[in-house]
């Protein structure tokens, strides 16, 4: 009798653990892709790889807001010392993400660090099956 009770408790515990494991997993490939994309972008920005970061920008956004040589040269003056996600919101049934990030930048020529806020807008492209950035690269000239 005692062993049956222990088996029942064991099964119940396994069911609870399985439910918790599933709750912690992304419910779709799109959600998994979102997490991977945001992490990849964060890593690229942390390493100050601005050309690679530009590859995340949506082509239609680039048509309206092309990245100038001056903007890229300006970004290359800086090394990222910190990248901290302040908030993330998911909208439009998971198709849009707004993320606010504080980025600390060290100016290699002036030996000065500054903090900027990067408001990112990400949208999932169903045809390409990937997340694209619709807000451009961080602006090291911003003042707040």
Residue ranges of predicted features:
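Bacterial N-terminal signal peptides that target proteins for export
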Residues: 2-13
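C-terminal motif of bacterial Sec signal peptides marking the signal peptidase cleavage site
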Residues: 22-24
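Short, aromatic-enriched amphipathic alpha-helices that serve as compact interaction elements
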Residues: 30-46, 56
């Amino acid at each position: 009798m005692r062993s049956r009770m222990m088996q029942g408790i064991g099964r119940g515990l396994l069911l609870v653990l399985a439910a918790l494991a599933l709750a912690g997993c992304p419910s779709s490939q799109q959600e998994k892709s979102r997490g991977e994309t945001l992490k990849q972008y964060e890593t690229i920005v942390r390493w100050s790889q601005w050309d690679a970061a530009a590859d995340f920008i949506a082509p239609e956004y680039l048509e309206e807001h092309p990245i100038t040589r001056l903007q890229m040269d300006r970004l290359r003056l800086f090394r990222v010392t910190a990248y901290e996600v302040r908030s993330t919101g998911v909208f439009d049934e998971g198709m849009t993400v707004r993320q606010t990030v504080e980025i600390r930048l060290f100016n290699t020529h002036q030996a000065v660090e500054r903090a900027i806020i990067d408001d990112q807008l990400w949208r999932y492209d169903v045809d390409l099956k990937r997340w694209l950035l619709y807000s451009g690269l961080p602006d090291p000239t911003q003042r707040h």
